[in-house]
UniProtKB/Swiss-Prot annotation:
Source species, domain of life: Eukaryota
Phenotype for V61Q: Loss of function in the interferon-gamma-mediated signaling pathway
Modified residues (Phosphothreonine): T372
Polar residues bias (residue ranges): 349-360
GO biological process terms held by the UniProt record: astrocyte activation; cellular response to virus; cytokine-mediated signaling pathway; defense response to virus; microglial cell activation; negative regulation of amyloid-beta clearance; positive regulation of amyloid-beta formation; positive regulation of gene expression
Keywords per UniProt: Cell membrane, Disease variant, Disulfide bond, Glycoprotein, Immunoglobulin domain, Membrane, Phosphoprotein, Receptor, Signal, Transmembrane, Transmembrane helix, Ubl conjugation
Record's bilayer topology term: Single-pass type I membrane protein
One term under GO cellular component: membrane
Protein name in the entry: Interferon gamma receptor 1
Post-translational changes noted in the entry: Phosphorylated at Ser/Thr residues. Phosphorylation of Tyr-457 is required for IFNG receptor signal transduction. Influenza virus infection leads to phosphorylation in a CSNK1A1-dependent manner.
Protein's organism: Homo sapiens
Signal peptide feature range: 1-17
Protein family: Belongs to the type II cytokine receptor family.
Length: 489
């Protein structure tokens, strides 16, 4: 009876166990799809796809290498939520084949494994382009080719070119393009003279100057003839040094010419827009009235005529009036009527005086002067009348008044003393009855000179002796221009 009672309980437990096993079967959780392996620079990565689930699924990736003893599935990634796995750490020989399988787990349920196809890193993977450097040395172009960087067991390193392995770059194809034409060169990595663990080097002779060289390269693997990606072109232009130097000459000349023309144009433009203006001179207040009176005053144009005459020495009672000669003359001695024997008269006193006439008015002579004027008659009609346009009066005269005294001059004893004075004279100073008239002998008109109409500090002048007209009222001192100033008149 007890056995009959226990039998139904055992049957119920077995049925429940079978039902639980059916729930955990492969058909209960979807399997991953499109499991693929991609490798770039020997860095293999597994990718897969999975449908959207209410719960977030997790994945497990296993790798199996071909040719390994006791080859088994090795866990590469466990319980990851993303849809890729890097298996570079679990790859032995890059040239050998490998397989990958992936399963999903949702909650407590797992899916079946999804397997990939056979994959070899060296055969099916991609390798990036090598790096290039180009330079010119003397008459050659040096090309440096650096091995592409790869990942081996998770470490970045250059591609193995050891011939003992089956996955290495055996040769580099170098493409040189010059002036549109392309030439291909090959570099064997097994030659120690050309390559080392880091780079390979190629020397190309320069065939023509003033040309552009563009270089690109790609590597070829030893296994299955797989090629790397082709590098970008690196260009260099070769110039002839002599031609390059000569090209600077016209460039510099053109630049200098442009600068000069620019400066000239700028100066001309500034001068045209902003012409130079005379700066006004600010005078002090004390000079303003003087400048105004000088600019407003009008002066008539003067005319100057010079008359050259000669005369003989003369004497007065107890008084001798001497005139300053114009030209150098030797006066060894003079005597008066009182002392005729004291000094011997060795030479006749001679001088040349000039009559200077002008149209200006004659100023008055300061009264009170005791100087005796000297009068001369002139045969020229220019000096006959004071009111005519040919008459001139100067404001000063130069005379020497001599009186009897014991005085020696120029080495000769004489009883007369001379007083030299400069003063301004007027008509009222000399009464007509007190003036002594002195006649000149041998008056002769030599030349008539028209003096320049203007004098200034820039014109040379010479002081001349006194002149008197027929009336004997004026005693004048004048200036005449020298021979050099006549050229400017």
């Amino acid at each position: 009876m007890a056995l009959l009672f226990l039998l139904p309980l055992v049957m119920q437990g077995v049925s429940r166990a079978e039902m639980g096993t059916a729930d955990l079967g492969p058909s209960s959780v979807p399997t991953p799809t499109n499991v693929t392996i991609e490798s770039y620079n020997m860095n293999p990565i597994v990718y897969w796809e999975y449908q959207i689930m209410p719960q977030v699924p997790v994945f497990t990736v296993e790798v199996k290498n071909y040719g390994v003893k006791n080859s088994e599935w090795i866990d590469a990634c466990i319980n990851i939520s993303h849809h890729y796995c890097n298996i570079s750490d679990h790859v032995g020989d890059p040239s050998n084949s490998l397989w990958v399988r992936v399963k999903a787990r949702v909650g407590q349920k797992e899916s079946a494994y999804a397997k990939s196809e056979e994959f070899a890193v060296c055969r099916d993977g991609k390798i990036g382009p090598p790096k290039l450097d180009i330079r010119k040395e003397e008459k050659q172009i040096m090309i440096d080719i650096f091995h592409p960087s790869v990942f081996v067991n998770g470490d970045e390193q250059e591609v193995d070119y050891d011939p003992e392995t089956t996955c290495y770059i055996r040769v580099y194809n170098v493409y040189v393009r010059m002036n549109g034409s392309e030439i291909q060169y090959k570099i064997l990595t097994q030659k120690e003279d050309d390559c080392d663990e880091i780079q390979c080097q190629l020397a190309i002779p320069v065939s023509s100057l003033n040309s552009q060289y563009c270089v690109s390269a790609e590597g070829v693997l030893h296994v299955w003839g797989v090629t790397t990606e082709k590098s970008k072109e690196v260009c260099i232009t070769i110039f002839n040094s002599s031609i390059k130097g000569s090209l600077w000459i016209p460039v510099v000349a053109a630049l200098l010419l442009f600068l000069v023309l620019s400066l000239v144009f700028i100066c001309f433009y500034i001068k045209k827009i902003n012409p130079l203006k005379e700066k006004s001179i600010i005078l002090p207040k004390s000079l303003i009235s003087v400048v105004r009176s000088a600019t407003l005053e009008t002066k008539p144009e003067s005319k100057y005529v010079s008359l050259i005459t000669s005369y003989q020495p003369f004497s007065l009672e107890k008084e001798v009036v001497c005139e300053e000669p114009l030209s150098p003359a030797t006066v060894p001695g003079m005597h008066t009527e009182d002392n005729p024997g004291k000094v011997e008269h060795t030479e006749e006193l001679s001088s040349i005086t000039e009559v200077v006439t002008t149209e200006e008015n004659i100023p008055d002579v300061v009264p009170g002067s005791h100087l005796t004027p000297i009068e001369r008659e002139s045969s020229s009609p220019l000096s006959s009348n004071q009111s005519e346009p040919g008459s001139i009066a100067l404001n000063s005269y130069h005379s020497r008044n001599c009186s009897e005294s014991d005085h020696s001059r120029n080495g000769f004893d004489t009883d007369s003393s001379c007083l030299e004075s400069h003063s301004s004279l007027s008509d009222s100073e000399f009464p007509p009855n007190n003036k002594g008239e002195i006649k000149t002998e041998g008056q002769e008109l030599i030349t008539v000179i028209k003096a320049p109409t203007s004098f200034g500090y820039d014109k040379p002048h010479v002081l001349v002796d006194l002149l008197v007209d027929d009336s004997g009222k004026e005693s004048l001192i004048g200036y005449r221009p020298t021979e050099d100033s006549k050229e400017f008149s």
